[in-house]
Amino acid sequence: MAQKEGLPAGRLSAMVIDEDKCHADSTSYMLSAELNFSVTVFTSPIKALDFLQNHAEGVDLVLADVHMEEMNGFDFLKVARELHKSIQVIMMSTETTMYTMKRCVKLGAQFLVNKPLDAGTIKNLWQYVDLKVLRMEKIKDLLQGIGDESTCANETNSLAENPKNDTKKKYYLMWTPHLQKKFLHALQILGKDASPKNIKKIMGVDNIDCRQIAAHLQKHRLRLTKDLKKASFTTDTSKDESNSRIGPAESHHVCRNASTLQPRSNTQPTETTMQILSEDAEYDDVYAAMRRALQYGIVFDESKHSSDPSGDEDEQVVVGGDQDGCANEANDIDSSGDHHQVAAVVTKPCNTNASQEIINKMTNSDGMQATKGSKAAVFRLVDYSESDSD
């Protein structure tokens, strides 16, 4: 049971101030049973203030009702805080409105709980109690055990017998700009042969070991790899952006230039071959026409078979007559008219290779004798006579 006067030592102490005696006793019982508090109950707020005035430092927690006839709960809270600034007060009220809670907190209360209190609320009261009180109690307990010489001697002996239990202190090395400069200089000298042991020799720093250098070397290489990947990604992105900036017109212009640069297909041999074939066919046609003219005794007009559109002078073949005095009859005609002679005269101001080739063909095929002149060529053909035929 809780005591109304005096505060027993060894446990956390609490005060319950409530004019409702039944509620005050039930609250005191739950505090003792659930939280192992040493509780003091007061039904008069004035007597509670007198007690606090003399024992304020020994009270850890105060639970006070807001609605009391002898003294208002807010006034009690204000005076109690003046007597002891670090005292922890939790207010109880049947009306837990926002206004009541704000006013309690403003005056220095830890929290406002709903009245009547139940076991669940009592169990959660420790959440509103400052843990500094509990820490102070633990400190007091530790301070009480310091004066025991036998305990200290036993602990000293155990540490001496088990030196492995003594943990080594770990310290972290900060890579200053000076160390980083030496580290990079060592890497530049060693190159591919860089190892933590060799780097340490070149750096010449005493307060550093190979493990720390190895860890820093690994981080340095990872950083370089990351920078290279980032640089390559940036380059690829810039190329894609430059290609995407080319518009349709520019791309068409580029394609057109590319097509201009491509070599054109050489069609000249094909055209030359076709021209030679057409000329050969033309020469054959002219040759056949001239033979027909000589055979049937008609005039050969080369203009009908000429393919030259430049308007050159036409070749003319005359059968059985004179041409500009350049050719005469080879034999006189007898009076009876039995002797006949056929002469062919070919005149051309421009002695072309085509006509010459045709004449040569005719001469070779028919056994003609050709005589060339400056202006025209006269060929003597076969004489036909009636006497020979008989």
UniProtKB/Swiss-Prot annotation:
Q: Please outline how this chain is modified post-translation.
A: Two-component system major event consists of a His-to-Asp phosphorelay between a sensor histidine kinase (HK) and a response regulator (RR). In plants, the His-to-Asp phosphorelay involves an additional intermediate named Histidine-containing phosphotransfer protein (HPt). This multistep phosphorelay consists of a His-Asp-His-Asp sequential transfer of a phosphate group between first a His and an Asp of the HK protein, followed by the transfer to a conserved His of the HPt protein and finally the transfer to an Asp in the receiver domain of the RR protein.
Q: Where does the record place the modification 4-aspartylphosphate?
A: 65
Biased region (Polar residues) positions are 257-271
**Response regulatory domain mapped to chain residues:** 13-130
Could you cite one Gene Ontology molecular function of this protein? DNA binding
Q: Name one GO cellular component term.
A: nucleus
Task: Note the DNA-binding span(s) on this chain.
Answer: 169-226
Which NCBIfam families does this entry report, sorted A to Z? myb_SHAQKYF
* Role played: Transcriptional activator that binds specific DNA sequence. Functions as a response regulator involved in His-to-Asp phosphorelay signal transduction system. Phosphorylation of the Asp residue in the receiver domain activates the ability of the protein to promote the transcription of target genes. May directly activate some type-A response regulators in response to cytokinins.
Q: What is this protein called?
A: Two-component response regulator ORR29
Q: What is the lineage of its organism?
A: Eukaryota, Viridiplantae, Streptophyta, Embryophyta, Tracheophyta
